[in-house]
Amino acid sequence: MTQMTPREIVHALDQYIIGQQEAKRSVAIALRNRWRRMQLDDSLRGEVVPKNILMIGPTGVGKTEIARRLAKLAGAPFIKVEATKFTEVGYVGRDVESIIRDLVEMAMKMVREQAKEEVAHKAEDATEERILDALLPRPRGSEYDHARDESSTRQTFRKKLREGQLDDKEIDIEITPQGGGFDISAPPGMEEMTSQLQSMFSNMGKQKSETRRVTVEEARRLLHDEEAAKLVNEEQIKHRAIEAVEQNGIVFLDEIDKVAKRGDSGSGGDVSREGVQRDLLPLIEGSTVSTKHGMVKTDHILFIASGAFHLSKPSDLIPELQGRLPIRVELQALTPDDFKRILTEPSAALTKQYQALLATDGLEVNFTDEGIARIAEIAWQVNDGTENIGARRLHTVMERLLEEPSFQGGDMASPLTIDAAYVDEQLGELATDEDLSRYIL
């Protein structure tokens, strides 16, 4: 997992997310504490439990984006799930234990890729020999069947192969198809059974190989994957994946407010919502979940929950669940200045995205500071006057603003300058007419 310090993690998040320093600091400290815990003695390590986080804030201010970026930084098994997908055991829908099963599958994939990288050099050597065997078939029954013939011809072909001179040449290779090709659909809540059936069917046809005629370049890719798969130890991968989940796993629970009881309502839906919360309790507190790869203890998995809490409050969650989310972080609503920074500062800001997209048609687009300030002001006004959807409003505003250039592309006069006057010409009437902006922006 990552060895970045909290300061470095916050700096990395700053490249994509504007503001929300308190939330960034909390997740950075939580992530660093995962690494710190792994440096402790075994006797103390088992006693240090993660401090789970509850992020509270309106929609579109960066809660989910923090999770997405954190997943890339973590270098640990990470899964993001929506709490609304799960139901109480006995109802139609997924049960909460499938979160851990999915997390284990993510870890298996991650550890397998790492294991393949570790044996990449050996796999490359074996791949090269198999391609040379296809290019220079050996005589049957010769004394070289079990020993490599390092003749001058083979060395010449090896040199050409490494230099890429034979990439376009077609050869016949024998490969074993990965998986059995079965795709089984199942109703919600039965994913585990489906997975086991697929595994069973794919194992039945595992040993059958087929001959394919492909180019050397494609053969190198296909054979490398097959040779790497032969070299890795599946049992060791399972053991490492389960250990990674138990010690470093992170679960991001989005939309947690949607399973909270809403005010004083006593509707039937609240029964199922409260059931989901009660099912989450043992996972967050620490329990053992059965997966097809083995038993997984959840005692040291970090849970980060988030929700907008428009129609409910954090106190509407059941008290036991509140107690298991001890760190509370409130994300702030975005200001006009935040909108302006969102349009310019991130490495993949919206303005840069549109400039790159339209440049493919030969249309150069330039944004002035006044134009960006006006776009930010309009987005904030519409949020303030209608429904506050945070930074997502910028997508709607920008799409409307650049609708004509996007349609005409290279037919428009280049360069196109987006200044305050152009923004007012395209969006001014919509921004001032609240009824119109309610439907269009």
From Swiss-Prot:
Which GO CC terms are listed, alphabetically?
Answer: HslUV protease complex
Q: Name one Pfam family in it.
A: AAA_2
Main localization, broad class? cytoplasm
Q: Where in the cell is it found?
A: Cytoplasm
Q: Name one GO molecular function term.
A: proteasome-activating activity
Q: Where do the record's region annotations for Disordered lie?
A: 131-158
Subunit and partners = A double ring-shaped homohexamer of HslV is capped on each side by a ring-shaped HslU homohexamer. The assembly of the HslU/HslV complex is dependent on binding of ATP.
Q: List the protein's name.
A: ATP-dependent protease ATPase subunit HslU
